[in-house]
Design a protein with these regions (language model features):
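Short, glycine-/Ser/Thr-/acidic-enriched flexible segments
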Residues: 79, 105, 165-167, 214-216, ...
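Active-site diphosphate/adenylate-binding microenvironment
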Residues: 8-21, 26-30, 34-39, 330-411
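Short amphipathic alpha-helices and their capping/turn segments at secondary-structure boundaries
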Residues: 87-89, 147-148, 262-264, 354-357, ...
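N-terminal alpha/beta PP-like core and its mobile active-site loop of ThDP/TPP-dependent enzymes
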Residues: 2-324, 440-442
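A general structural motif
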Residues: 51-52, 111-112, 184-197, 256-257, ...
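Surface-exposed loop/turn positions
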Residues: 68, 205, 362, 412, ...
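Thiamine diphosphate
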Residues: 100, 108-115, 230, 374-523
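Phosphate/pyrophosphate-binding active-site segments
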Residues: 2, 137, 276-372, 468-471, ...
Length: 523
């Protein structure tokens, strides 16, 4: 370790003492003091991303799997701007992240150099907390505050802005290695009155239990299953959970539909008891469709994402099983009909083979509806595993989130089930996967089009034969060669065109170390 301890050393030393073990970084000149200090402060793994959105998405995936914050290190306002989309997704997932932004030296800011910007204003919409350090002496207190704020329930991004002169200045005091790691405080308990009211309502009418956050933990799912057995209620998970355990001996979960008319049909006139989720709203505003998809008089809030939803469901299960004289058959799981099966190799074939081969405790990072929807309809038949989805709708999350999950849990195989259009947003993550030798299988569902946009155009009555409509939603002129692209980033790959070829490629990938890309040529 260098004899001279700087503010950068103090920052990293304090972060390590608070529990930081990984830093996803795309540094620039203003962050070089931190880069240098990483050589001296042991215990924090530096992971280089070639694009800031890779770093922020990886920190999100790391947090979802581990429950603890990673550090991100970004360069000034423009670097932060490049990472904002995945910080938006992380905010929606309630992921704890400590997001460090280097700034110009404090004495240089007034000269308005080309990279100068209002970092606080850029950071605020995606951050639960924004803290600016003004001097080296403030660093240790600021990093502790950032950790504590990020871990406060339900979890958030804490952005810490540190000017380069504060990082380069001598440390006011050495970081204490004896400092206690930052931990999440226990979730807030749901009041007894709310439990009793939920039990009263669920005993009088047909009900749907809508689960999110920790209601989707094993405890939450099993308690919800007991409630369903006692009352005949249906159990539905939110459309895009941050992370959910599926398969094995866990209960089968219905998934909330996407389009508003499908949600209203799915829920019918049942009253909806919300645990760890939000009341259903339409993803977009559609003419003639309401934004709120369940009337207020049919909603009961059992718990919010910042409350102990699993415990609340267990307490509710005790209430309803005590008052119920007989077990009722749970309502059948409603599974949407799949579109008429196309000939040849289809998304259903991809989903089916994944279900058959997925190893125990695997992690699936899912982005895109082409293969995602058919997979989630079948996931209950797989071995027990975890699924992460795109919580905020900003595409380009799937591959970086899988990267972060692989670093958080190196003993689990990660599968990125990824649509080809959104994969291009953060394709640089492939390079980091190769460099870090991560056990990740990338299944690229290559239909060479923006399928969701084509669906939306059809719903609006717009023909896809129009020159602009076709030109703006097709990705086949030229087609992206995913195998060559992966090879260029250091990831071996194979292109498959039949279910049999996919079966063999998937088996080979799951039994080989390191990353591998499988390009599935789909209709």
């Amino acid at each position: 370790m260098t004899a001279r301890q700087t503010g950068a050393h103090a920052l990293l030393g304090a972060a390590h003492a608070l529990g930081a073990r990984v830093c996803f970084a795309n540094p620039g000149t203003t962050e070089l003091a931190l880069v240098s200090a990483l050589d001296d402060v042991r215990g924090i793994r530096p992971v280089l991303g070639l694009f800031e959105g890779v770093c922020t998405g990886a920190a999100d995936g790391y947090a979802r799997v581990s429950g603890t914050p990673a550090l991100t290190l970004l360069h000034l306002g423009p670097g932060l701007a490049n990472g904002l989309a995945n910080l938006h997704n992380a905010r929606r997932a309630h992921s704890p992240i400590v997001n460090i932004i280097g700034d110009h030296a404090s004495w240089h800011l007034r000269y308005d150099a080309p990279l100068t910007s209002d970092i606080e204003t850029l950071a605020r919409p995606m951050s639960g907390t924004v803290i600016r350090v003004n001097a080296s002496a403030e660093i240790q207190g600021a990093i502790r505050q950032a950790f504590e704020r990020s871990l406060a329930h339900p979890g958030s991004v804490a952005t810490l802005i540190v000017p380069t002169d504060a990082m380069e200045a001598p440390a006011a005091e050495p970081a204490s290695s004896d400092a206690a790691p930052a931990h999440r405080i226990p979730l807030a308990a749901v009041s007894h009155e709310r439990i009793v009211e939920a039990a009263r309502r669920i005993g009088r009418a047909r009900a749907v239990l809508l689960l999110g956050a920790d209601a989707l933990s094993e405890r939450g799912q099993r308690a919800a299953s007991r409630i369903a057995a006692a009352t005949g209620a249906r159990v539905i998970m939110e459309s895009y959970p941050a992370i959910v355990a599926l398969g094995g001996d866990l209960p089968r979960l219905e998934r909330l539909a996407y389009f508003p008319e499908d949600v209203r049909s799915q829920l019918g006139d049942d009253f909806v008891l919300v645990a760890g989720s939000r009341a259903p709203v339409s993803y977009f505003g559609y003419p003639g469709q309401p934004s709120e998809l369940v009337a207020q008089n049919r909603l009961v809030l059992l718990s919010s994402p910042g409350e102990d939803s699993a415990l609340a469901l267990e307490q509710l299960a005790e209430q309803v099983t005590r008052s119920s004289n007989a077990t009722r058959a749970p309502a059948p799981v409603t599974v949407p009909d799949e579109a008429q099966r196309a000939s040849g190799f289809t998304p259903a074939d991809v989903a089916e083979e994944l279900v058959l081969q997925l190893p125990e405790n695997a992690i699936v990072s899912l982005e895109g509806s082409s293969c995602g929807a058919p997979y989630l309809r079948r996931a209950h038949r797989a071995r027990r595993h975890w699924v992460m989805t795109n919580t905020g709708g900003a595409i380009g999350q799937g591959i970086p989130c899988g990267l972060g999950a692989a670093i958080a849990r190196p003993d689990s195989r990660v599968i990125c089930l990824q649509s080809d259009g959104s994969a291009q947003y953060t394709v640089q993550a492939l390079w980091t996967m190769a460099r870090e030798a991560l056990d990740v299988t990338l299944v690229i569902c290559a239909n060479h089009r923006y399928g969701i946009l084509q669906t939306e155009l059809r719903r609006a009555g717009v023909s896809l034969d129009g020159q602009a409509s076709a030109h703006m939603t097709r990705l086949d002129a030229p087609r992206v060669d995913w195998v060559s692209l992966g090879r260029g980033y250091g990831v071996p790959g194979v292109r498959v065109q039949t279910a049999e070829e996919f079966r063999d490629a998937l088996r080979a990938s799951l039994h080989a170390p390191g990353p591998m890309l499988i390009e599935c040529q789909l209709p």
